[in-house]
Design a protein with these regions (language model features):
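Charged, heptad-repeat coiled-coil alpha-helices that serve as long linker/dimerization "arms"
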Residues: 1-88
Length: 88
């Protein structure tokens, strides 16, 4: 039988570290900012202004990239939890 307690501890440590990283990266506000930027990009005065639309698009993509990495880390931890549960 596999000693899952060691793995659960590692998972909990990773979850804590990811939560701390989420606070440091201000993930919740980043998600809100992305929504705001996407709404702005839909406005005619923005998408008809090349400079503004380029700036907003760049900012939105940078946020998407951060969120993608963060979300992948969350998913990896969740997958590891499922694997450990199956091993028990």
């Amino acid at each position: 039988m596999i000693r899952t307690d060691v793995y659960w501890q590692k998972i909990n440590d990773l979850k804590t570290a990811l939560k701390d990283a989420g606070y440091s990266l201000d993930i919740d506000n980043q998600r809100e900012e992305l929504l705001r930027l996407e709404k702005e990009l839909e406005k005619e005065e923005v998408y008809t202004n090349l400079e503004k639309s380029t700036e907003y698009s760049r900012k939105a993509q940078a946020i998407r990239n951060k969120l993608e990495v963060f979300d992948k880390a969350e998913k990896a931890i969740s997958d590891a939890e499922e694997i450990i549960t199956l091993a028990e």
